[in-house]
A protein has these predicted regions:
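Short, internal active-site loops enriched in acidic
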Residues: 101-106
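Helix-start/capping segments and mature chain N-termini
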Residues: 1-73, 77-84, 107-181
Length: 181
């Protein structure tokens, strides 16, 4: 994965990868209040094509509404920003990660009054479990961590806090020698 070269779209500007920084007191870092999407861009005869760009961008805004987060850009602006990140980084295909989160201005649980920031990263993607996973197969484990019941969170919204169990399951699987949990 690309970690230092290229550009990230951050709050309306393309900045060097290492320049996309966030304050340590960012509300979303402390309370898991962020929304994000994961999109694939595929190589086509007409250049890179971002799969279901409009639908993913719409879901980002729908997810933000769950947290009463007002994204300071329009859907059209974020769709163009996602295209710009792919273009600027010279990707024929890859993975995009737009994320919106509350800034550092507020302490405590309620983020009301905090700024909202948006970042979009894109990088080459060889596949979630590696480029040879299809050919070699993968080892999976049923995790001891149960998925939250549908009434305890919002499964249709891409909320960062909703991924805590999945992260624990993935770590448990890896510690047991599996590819995925």
């Amino acid at each position: 994965m690309q970690t230092s070269d290229g550009f990230i779209w951050y709050d309306g500007a393309l900045v060097p990868w290492t320049g996309a920084t966030t304050h340590v007191l960012t509300h979303s870092l402390h309370y898991g209040v962020a929304v994000f999407e994961g999109l694939r861009a595929y190589e086509t005869l007409r250049g890179p094509g971002i799969f279901r760009l409009r639908e993913h961008t719409r879901r980002l805004f729908d997810s933000a509404r769950v947290y009463r987060m007002k994204i300071p850009f329009s859907e059209a602006e974020l769709m163009e920003a996602q295209c710009a990140v792919v273009r600027t980084n010279g990707l024929a295909a890859g993975y995009l990660r737009p994320i919106a989160f509350y800034g550092p201005e507020k302490r405590g649980l309620n983020p009301r009054g905090a700024s909202v920031h948006v970042g979009i990263a894109a990088w080459r993607w060889e596949g979630y479990l590696g480029p040879d996973a299809r050919a070699r197969g993968v080892r999976v484990k049923t995790s001891s961590y149960a998925r939250h019941h549908v009434n305890t969170n919002l499964p249709r919204a891409k909320l960062s806090a909703s991924y805590a169990n999945a992260i624990l399951a993935s770590m448990e699987a890896a510690e047991g020698g599996y590819d995925e949990g």
